[in-house]
């Protein structure tokens, strides 16, 4: 039985700034490739929760892997749900159901309420 195709949409991510190398006469500027990560967002949340606490680069790397993993799981599950219901669009409803299926008990409840709050804030700002 063929497995449903997994969608991997590229989320908008912010991270380290591009660094330019020193320029010689006649040379064109070469920019270093951007490494996308969730590090600035993880850092912002850390400062909201614990303003006096820092984070090591190794811990940040672990957090980045964690966020990427959870994103892929939720996106995959939401894609499957849309496919089962013969829909071609992943809506907030599929995301919410995917979160309920993937996260355990109280964690799912909190995630759903925070997600609902974020969607409400977004739609009211439009």
Curated annotation (Swiss-Prot):
<feature type="glycosylation site" description="O-linked (GlcNAc) serine">
    <location>
        <position position="113"/>
    </location>
</feature>
<protein>
    <recommendedName>
        <fullName>Histone H2B 7</fullName>
    </recommendedName>
</protein>
<dbReference type="InterPro" id="IPR055333">
    <property type="entry name" value="HISTONE_H2B_site"/>
</dbReference>
<keyword id="KW-0007">Acetylation</keyword>
<dbReference type="GO" id="GO:0030527">
    <property type="term" value="F:structural constituent of chromatin"/>
</dbReference>
<feature type="modified residue" description="N6-acetyllysine">
    <location>
        <position position="16"/>
    </location>
</feature>
<keyword id="KW-0597">Phosphoprotein</keyword>
<feature type="modified residue" description="N6-acetyllysine">
    <location>
        <position position="21"/>
    </location>
</feature>
<dbReference type="GO" id="GO:0000786">
    <property type="term" value="C:nucleosome"/>
</dbReference>
<keyword id="KW-1017">Isopeptide bond</keyword>
<comment type="similarity">
    <text>Belongs to the histone H2B family.</text>
</comment>
<dbReference type="InterPro" id="IPR000558">
    <property type="entry name" value="Histone_H2B"/>
</dbReference>
<feature type="region of interest" description="Disordered">
    <location>
        <begin position="1"/>
        <end position="35"/>
    </location>
</feature>
<dbReference type="GO" id="GO:0044877">
    <property type="term" value="F:protein-containing complex binding"/>
</dbReference>
<feature type="modified residue" description="N6-acetyllysine">
    <location>
        <position position="6"/>
    </location>
</feature>
<dbReference type="InterPro" id="IPR007125">
    <property type="entry name" value="Histone_H2A/H2B/H3"/>
</dbReference>
<keyword id="KW-0238">DNA-binding</keyword>
<keyword id="KW-0832">Ubl conjugation</keyword>
<dbReference type="GO" id="GO:0005634">
    <property type="term" value="C:nucleus"/>
</dbReference>
<feature type="cross-link" description="Glycyl lysine isopeptide (Lys-Gly) (interchain with G-Cter in ubiquitin)">
    <location>
        <position position="121"/>
    </location>
</feature>
<keyword id="KW-0544">Nucleosome core</keyword>
<keyword id="KW-0325">Glycoprotein</keyword>
<dbReference type="InterPro" id="IPR009072">
    <property type="entry name" value="Histone-fold"/>
</dbReference>
<feature type="compositionally biased region" description="Low complexity">
    <location>
        <begin position="1"/>
        <end position="12"/>
    </location>
</feature>
<dbReference type="GO" id="GO:0003677">
    <property type="term" value="F:DNA binding"/>
</dbReference>
<comment type="subunit">
    <text>The nucleosome is a histone octamer containing two molecules each of H2A, H2B, H3 and H4 assembled in one H3-H4 heterotetramer and two H2A-H2B heterodimers. The octamer wraps approximately 147 bp of DNA.</text>
</comment>
<dbReference type="Pfam" id="PF00125">
    <property type="entry name" value="Histone"/>
</dbReference>
<keyword id="KW-0539">Nucleus</keyword>
<feature type="modified residue" description="Phosphoserine">
    <location>
        <position position="15"/>
    </location>
</feature>
<feature type="modified residue" description="N6-acetyllysine">
    <location>
        <position position="13"/>
    </location>
</feature>
<keyword id="KW-0158">Chromosome</keyword>
<feature type="compositionally biased region" description="Basic residues">
    <location>
        <begin position="13"/>
        <end position="34"/>
    </location>
</feature>
<dbReference type="GO" id="GO:0046982">
    <property type="term" value="F:protein heterodimerization activity"/>
</dbReference>
<comment type="function">
    <text>Core component of nucleosome. Nucleosomes wrap and compact DNA into chromatin, limiting DNA accessibility to the cellular machineries which require DNA as a template. Histones thereby play a central role in transcription regulation, DNA repair, DNA replication and chromosomal stability. DNA accessibility is regulated via a complex set of post-translational modifications of histones, also called histone code, and nucleosome remodeling.</text>
</comment>
């Amino acid at each position: 039985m063929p497995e449903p195709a997994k969608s991997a949409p590229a989320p908008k991510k912010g991270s380290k700034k591009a660094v330019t190398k020193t320029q010689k006469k006649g040379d064109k500027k070469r920019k270093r490739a951007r490494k996308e990560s969730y590090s600035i967002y993880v850092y912002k949340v850390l400062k909201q929760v614990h303003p006096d606490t820092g984070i090591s680069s190794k811990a940040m790397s672990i957090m980045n892997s964690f966020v990427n993993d959870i994103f892929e799981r939720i996106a995959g599950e939401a894609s499957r749900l849309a496919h089962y219901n013969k829909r071609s669009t992943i809506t907030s409803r599929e995301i919410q159901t995917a979160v309920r299926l993937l996260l355990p008990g109280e964690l799912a409840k909190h995630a759903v309420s925070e997600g609902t709050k974020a969607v409400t804030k977004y739609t009211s700002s439009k």
